[in-house]
Amino acid sequence: MSFSKEVKEEITKQMNNARHCRLAEIAALLSACGHVIQKDGEIKSIVLQTENILVARKYFTLLKKTFNINTEILIRKNKAGKNSLLFLLVVKLPKQVSLLYQATKLSLHHELGDKALVVDPIVVQNTCCKRAFVRGLFLAAGSMSDPEKTYHYEIVFPDLERASQLQEIINSFLIDAKIVLRKKYYVVYVKEGSQIVDLLNIMEAHTSLMDFENVRILKEMRNSINRQVNCEAANINKTVTAAAKQIDDILFIRDTIGFDNLTEGLEEIAELRISYPESSLKELGAMLNPPIGKSGVNHRLKKLCSIADGLRQ
């Protein structure tokens, strides 16, 4: 099962006690995958159409708990995809249609198409209702990448108006949601790991949140270890390169003027550097009598390099 589906499985089980929050979630589901059927300018039925059984199940339960409506469910083969089904939940009794339409404050936006249902901002004025609204939209039209691979949360809309409404709601939680046009759809997305954690908390997907956080912590630990290893490898390469040049300079001095022309301190460190090419400056300093520190060894080796450079000119 994908991580996105796990999140949806979890939020399907979330059911608000407050009626106004349930209305916000119903409005979100209908805005994402609902439409109305009209005749002579009058709304005859409200239909939710989805390929996702989780959406159908949640909508059915919300209608039952909120309005005591037992929705008619139609199951059809999906012509757009092989071996998949379409679930159609239809409310068509006049009183129920009127009650549902008015309670959810939905409205038809003819500029977006005769069937486009837009949610009135009054439905999501409370913070708790905003949470329910985001949860409903993610369930109906959202997806989330596996955190093992990448961090990405998105909800897809056919028009900018509904995308902008969600962006504004998510941003009210201090989360930086952005909108991108992908083909003919508007995608509201979040890519920062800690902000996706916040979104999971907003949707009350607490188990998924812990799973996401565990993966994120492990990834950060691995990245930290990799950076440390890379840094150490770079330091080793730097040390090896420096040691190779030091040895090359020392051998040039030996073959040109000999060590007898060096001071006692320089001769000692020159002999040690040749004898122990893999030793660190600290280790070389400890071999001297009396021992000297890393900076003292470095000073002598630089002096030898300077002598070699002078001889080459």
From Swiss-Prot:
Residues 280-313 bind DNA. One of its GO terms (molecular function) is DNA binding. Gene3D superfamilies: Homing endonucleases. InterPro entries: Homing_endonucl (IPR027434), Sporu_reg_WhiA_N_dom (IPR018478), Sporulation_regulator_WhiA (IPR003802), Sporulation_regulator_WhiA_C (IPR023054), WhiA_LAGLIDADG_dom (IPR039518). It comes from the Bacteria. The keyword Glycoprotein does not apply. The keyword Translocase does not apply. Keywords: Cell cycle, Cell division, DNA-binding. GO terms for biological process: cell division; regulation of sporulation. Involved in cell division and chromosome segregation. Belongs to the WhiA family. This is Probable cell division protein WhiA. The lineage of its organism: Bacteria, Bacillati, Bacillota, Clostridia, Lachnospirales.
